[in-house]
A protein has these predicted regions:
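Basic, polyanion-binding surface patches
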Residues: 1-212
Length: 212
């Protein structure tokens, strides 16, 4: 029988990053040093964010201890700066599973990535000035994931984290004049699609609840 054009095959991809925004999560360690965690497992519901972070990452440890973070949302031109810090960790010594992936310790990811730190209004961790959207947040809940049957025994697992957004900062260039709305014609988030970086294309339509 000829293919209909909508037939599907069963595959087992190594990752399910089908297309989510990249975020740079800034936190403070116990000495007050700032860390940047690049990640892409984040989604929003009203004024809440839900994140998935590695259970052995420095950023996760900082957030669980300090209860505060800034979720900075970059645009596509920042992808090269993000990749400069991608294979680094604030943890020392470097966890075994990250050593196996070629990670190295980096105490100052701001300098390595060429990022500018700027003070937050309501939380201690700094914002990243280059990111067009910067969300100050406080921790509400955290839950460790349940291992699956196929999970590697050496995999550190991940933590599901719920955050409350307490302040939103935006570059004026992406805000509609005289409003509180982000101009979707000017704002293009950096997307992570099966470990590749993309921006958004032209608008295809609008949801019935859109206010602009």
């Amino acid at each position: 029988m000829p293919a209909s054009g909508h037939d599907a095959i069963t595959i087992r991809p190594s990752t399910l990053y089908f297309g989510t925004p990249v975020a740079l999560v800034t936190t403070l360690d116990e000495r007050g040093a700032a860390n940047i965690t690049p990640m892409s497992s984040v989604w929003a519901l009203d004024d809440r964010l839900v994140l998935g972070l590695s259970g052995q990452g420095q950023g996760c440890a900082n957030l669980l201890r300090g209860g505060e973070a800034v979720v900075n949302l970059p645009d596509p031109p920042l992808h090269a700066a993000i990749e400069r810090i991608a294979r680094t960790t604030g943890r020392a010594p470097v966890p075994d599973y990250k050593q196996a992936l070629g990670y190295r310790h980096e105490a100052d990811k701001f300098a390595l990535g060429g990022f500018t730190r700027t003070a937050s209004h309501a939380v201690a961790p700094p914002r990243i000035a280059e990111c067009p959207l910067q969300l100050e947040t406080r921790l509400l809940h955290a839950r460790r994931s349940t291992p699956g049957d196929d999970d590697d025994a050496h995999d550190p697992g991940f933590i599901v984290i719920e955050l409350a957004v307490v302040h939103v900062h935006a570059h004026p260039a992406i805000v509609l004049d005289g409003t509180q709305h982000v101009d979707t014609a000017r704002w293009s988030p950096l997307l992570y699609v099966f470990r590749h970086y993309f921006g958004t294309g032209e608008r295809r339509g609008r949801n019935f609840r859109a206010e602009t």
